[in-house]
From Swiss-Prot:
GO terms for molecular function: structural constituent of ribosome. This is Large ribosomal subunit protein bL27. Residues 1-22 are annotated as: Disordered. Keywords: Ribonucleoprotein, Ribosomal protein. NCBIfam families: L27 (TIGR00062). The keyword Metal-binding does not apply. SUPFAM superfamilies: Ribosomal L27 protein-like. Transmembrane segments: none annotated. It comes from the Bacteria. One of its GO terms (cellular component) is ribosome. PANTHER family: LARGE RIBOSOMAL SUBUNIT PROTEIN BL27M, RIBOSOMAL PROTEIN L27.
Length: 86
């Protein structure tokens, strides 16, 4: 048996909390201006029509409507489609 504690054990034992990234609103889901659609590191998903891009690459809705995800030329894009008023 060892008479001393393992060398690195006192320097271990910490972990950072998860950053809560990912898609926050699904395809076809209703959003209002300011709703966060995607939280991400870098532009894994690119902004399309009627969405804004924050300085931390958060994609958010600029208008009221429904979320639409699509792929163009190997780029994932998110749009917000305006709901036709009746």
């Amino acid at each position: 048996m060892a008479t001393k504690k393992a060398g690195g054990s006192s320097r271990n034992g910490r972990d950072s909390a998860g950053r809560r990234l990912g898609v926050k609103k699904a395809d076809g889901q209703y959003v209002i201006p300011g709703n966060i659609i995607v939280r991400q590191r870098g532009t894994k998903i690119h902004p399309g029509m009627n969405v804004g891009l924050g300085k931390d690459h958060t994609i958010f809705a600029l208008i009221e409507g429904r979320v639409e995800f699509l792929t163009k030329r190997n780029h994932k894009i998110v749009n917000v489609k305006e709901i036709a008023s009746t």
